């Protein structure tokens, strides 16, 4: 990740990647150590200006470093266009967000695969805490592409870099299909759940969290939705607006 200064401007991750890392699989000791070094609370910093210099040291920031737009047969890179200010002691990790066009569904070809891999490897080369995150919501027909992509990323990332992948909450409930996903951390997003919202919230309240083996390590929640009564070793928090101290206080445990 880009080195962080006392008040640093984080800009785009761009360019191609040359060398690749060692072969590794999910759950390696090195990757587990990298994840263990992350704070238990991570704020998602989306594509907008963010000043998080007030953030307590026990929290970190997962910031969108770049977006790869998949349109038809093309992969269009959109580097981060807004500043992010953090303190030097704040743990940060880069997120590569994948935006698959609804109007022109992506072909999910080799060039698009390669473009995503290039951005993830570029993020890993600049990483401080050795964790990178892929944010890619796929349709059922696109699942084989995601499985192959994540497997390729895990093979090509250095063994000491952990791979975190976001997941729809339904993938960790009745529509569980991610057991073979070669990620070191899976983050089920328990917000924006549409028609599954009521059922999944009931399930989480009854079980105390997701119980599927790959879905217990982390949980994604949002500031503008009802509190999710569920445990998770690490919590990622999304805000639809720029973060401030009031929003931070709102998401603290009662």
Which residue stretches match the model-derived regions?
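Secreted glycan hydrolases and related glycan-binding modules that recognize and/or cleave
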Residues: 1-254
């Amino acid at each position: 990740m880009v080195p962080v200064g006392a008040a640093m401007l984080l800009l785009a991750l761009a360019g191609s990647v040359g060398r690749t890392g060692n072969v590794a699989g999910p759950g390696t000791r090195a990757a587990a150590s990298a994840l263990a070094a992350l704070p238990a609370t991570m704020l998602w910093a989306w594509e907008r200006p963010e000043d998080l210099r007030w953030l307590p040291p026990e929290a970190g920031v997962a910031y969108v470093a770049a977006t790869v737009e998949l349109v038809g047969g093309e992969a269009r890179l959109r580097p981060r266009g807004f500043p992010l200010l953090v303190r030097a002691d704040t743990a940060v990790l880069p997120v590569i967000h994948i935006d698959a066009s609804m109007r022109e569904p992506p072909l999910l070809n080799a060039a698009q695969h390669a473009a995503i891999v290039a951005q993830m490897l570029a993020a890993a080369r600049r990483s401080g805490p050795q964790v990178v995150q892929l944010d890619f919501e796929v349709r059922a027909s696109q699942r084989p592409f995601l499985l192959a992509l994540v497997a390729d990323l895990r093979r090509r990332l250095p063994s000491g870099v952990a791979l975190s992948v976001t997941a729809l909450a339904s993938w960790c409930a009745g529509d569980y299909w991610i057991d073979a996903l070669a990620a070191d951390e899976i983050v089920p997003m328990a917000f924006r759940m549409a028609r599954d919202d009521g059922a999944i919230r009931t399930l989480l309240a009854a079980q105390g969290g997701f119980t599927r083996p790959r879905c217990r390590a982390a949980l994604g929640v949002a500031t503008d939705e009802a509190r999710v009564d569920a445990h998770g070793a690490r919590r990622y928090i999304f805000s639809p607006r720029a973060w401030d101290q009031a929003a931070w206080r709102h998401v603290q445990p009662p």
